[in-house]
Amino acid sequence: MATGPRYKVPMRRRREARTDYHQRLRLLKSGKPRLVARKSNKHVRAQLVTLGPNGDDTLASAHSSDLAEYGWEAPTGNMPSAYLTGLLAGLRAQEAGVEEAVLDIGLNSPTPGSKVFAIQEGAIDAGLDIPHNDDVLADWQRTRGAHIAEYDEQLEEPLYSGDFDAADLPEHFDELRETLLDGDIEL
């Protein structure tokens, strides 16, 4: 490790590869709440966060495991569940009085058509005003999960174990999306 009077130890969260402080500062300067989109292999999370005097304050959040409360039976780490998680977070943000936000993807790569942009698309469809480029959003059929259903039809054995059939994923997605957008449920 480097030593000497000119060596500067990076901040802890930068050393752990958890925070890009230059990007964070640019997002905070906008003065708008941040739509924090985080993904893992099994789940996705969407939070609307503002800067507070004692750290960040969460105004609204949704986790892909929350979708089970509304009837989601498919796995929670795919594109359709990312979109629905963003939609749910956007609806909860609307209830909290948030109207606009900026997307914070953290250290995730800004790959067009990825799950973080599916979260953004869901929040936009919920009514949030988020500046974006339409080129980064995935094709609607991919967001619905049609690519998963097509892959399942090619397999000899079912893609998912259990009662859920992956061939029904686009229809299941449409049903839950309509349920969330109708507003007949408690968020």
Curated annotation (Swiss-Prot):
* Keyword Phosphoprotein attributed: no
**GO annotations of cellular component type:** cytosolic large ribosomal subunit
Q: Which Pfam families match?
A: Ribosomal_L5e (PF17144)
A molecular function annotated in GO for this UniProt entry is:
structural constituent of ribosome
Under CDD domains, the record lists: Ribosomal_L18_L5e
Query: Might you name a Gene Ontology BP term for this protein?
Result: translation
* Keyword terms: Ribonucleoprotein, Ribosomal protein, RNA-binding, rRNA-binding
List the InterPro entries hit by this protein, alphabetically: Rbsml_uL18_euk
The Swiss-Prot or TrEMBL record describes its family as follows: Belongs to the universal ribosomal protein uL18 family.
User: What is its biological role?
Assistant: This is one of 5 proteins that mediate the attachment of the 5S rRNA onto the large ribosomal subunit, where it forms part of the central protuberance and stabilizes the orientation of adjacent RNA domains.
Query: What does the subunit section of this Swiss-Prot or TrEMBL entry state?
Result: Part of the 50S ribosomal subunit. Interacts with proteins L5 and L21e, and attaches the 5S rRNA to the 23S rRNA. Has been cross-linked to L21e.
Q: What is this protein called?
A: Large ribosomal subunit protein uL18
Q: Which organism is it from?
A: Haloarcula marismortui (strain ATCC 43049 / DSM 3752 / JCM 8966 / VKM B-1809)
